[in-house]
Amino acid sequence: MGNIETVQAVYEAFGAGDVDTIMGFLADDVDWSAEAEGTVAPWYGRRTKAEVPAFFQAIAENLEVTDFEVLSIAANDTDVMAVIRFGETVKRTGKSGSMTLHHWWRFRDGKVVLYRGTEDTALTAELLTP
């Protein structure tokens, strides 16, 4: 499986809520981070492999994902970049919004060794605030 296919498989597993499958694609020393200033969203911050399930748990506990569409994906030998349209409704506030996500994936020996995700942090803060 190539790197783009691996990222697509991760996205399919995310859509199915299958964190165990996602974990199988990660190297033991993965450096995982949803990069953002502040801590308004519980999925923000850097994580080790052991902490990655908490990233997905925080999303599942707080959001109903209403749209997840890969708009563009490109790769070189080690990296995959993806642009995603993401729609969400925050369970606690009932507020909904849509944004563009940017994901950078780096691979070594077929495993994810680095993930960086960015999102519209201002919109996220607005949606999470009652």
Task: For each feature predicted by the language model, list its residue ranges.
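A beta-strand edge to alpha-helix "cap/lid" segment located at domain peripheries
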Residues: M1, A54-P130
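Residues at secondary-structure transition points
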Residues: M1, E5, W43-A50, S96
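Short, low-complexity N-terminal intrinsically disordered segments enriched in polar/charged residues
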Residues: M1-F25, L127-P130
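Generic alpha-helical hydrophobic packing signal
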Residues: V7-Q8, I22, K49, P53, ...
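Short, flexible active-site loop motifs that bind/organize anionic cofactors or intermediates
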Residues: A9-E12, P42, L114
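Short, charged low-complexity linear motifs
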Residues: G17-D20, A41, T89-R92
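Conserved functional loop/turn residues at catalytic and ligand-binding sites
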Residues: D18, D29, K111
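A solvent-exposed, acidic/Ser-Thr-rich amphipathic alpha-helical stretch
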Residues: T21, A27-D77
